[in-house]
C-alpha cells in the first residue's frame, strides 16, 4: 500500500507540481512586495489628486466609501508580472527541454525502424539471388564476372 503511494509521489509530474507550488508561493510574495512598494505608489500618484481625492480611478459611492480602481489596477499588474516571469522562467524552458527529449526518442525509434527495414531488404535481395540470408554471406560467389567486351552504344 505504501509502495504504491511512494511510486505515485516519485513520479515526475507530482514532484514538478510540488516544486512549482513552492516556487510560485515564494515568487508571489516577492512580486506582491514589488507591486505594493513601487507600482501602487506610482498609480496612486498619477490616479489620485492628493488634495481633492478626486480621480478617474476612484469612484465615490456616498459617505466616506469609494471604489478604488487603483488597487484593482495594481493587482492586475501584479498578476501580469507573475504570469510573465513564470512563463519565461519555467514554462518555456520546460517545454523546450521536453521537446528536445521527444526529438531524441523519435530519432531512436526512426533508426530502429530503418535497421529493421534494411535487414528485410537484405534478406529479400539474398533470397532473389539464391544465396542464404544473413550478414555473413560469402560474396565471392555472388560477384559477377567482369565483361570486357565493347559496349554496344559506343
Curated annotation (Swiss-Prot):
A Gene Ontology cellular component where this protein is annotated is: plasma membrane
Q: Name one Pfam family in it.
A: MscL
Q: Where are the transmembrane segments?
A: 12-32, 71-91
Record's superkingdom? Bacteria
Q: What keywords does the record list, in alphabetical order?
A: Cell membrane, Ion channel, Ion transport, Membrane, Transmembrane, Transmembrane helix, Transport
Q: Where is this chain primarily localised?
A: membrane
Q: Where can this protein be found? A: Cell membrane
Annotated segments matching region Disordered: 129-154
Question: What are the GO MF terms of this UniProt record?
Answer: mechanosensitive monoatomic ion channel activity
User: What membrane topology was assigned to this protein in its record?
Assistant: Multi-pass membrane protein
Look up keyword Transmembrane helix and say if it applies: yes
Say if the entry is tagged with keyword Secreted.
Answer: no
SUPFAM superfamilies, alphabetized: Gated mechanosensitive channel
What interactions and quaternary structure are annotated?
Homopentamer.
HAMAP family for this protein: MscL (MF_00115)
In the record, the note on similarity to other proteins reads: Belongs to the MscL family.
The record describes the protein's role as: Channel that opens in response to stretch forces in the membrane lipid bilayer. May participate in the regulation of osmotic pressure changes within the cell.
- Name of the protein: Large-conductance mechanosensitive channel
Q: What's the encoding gene here?
A: mscL
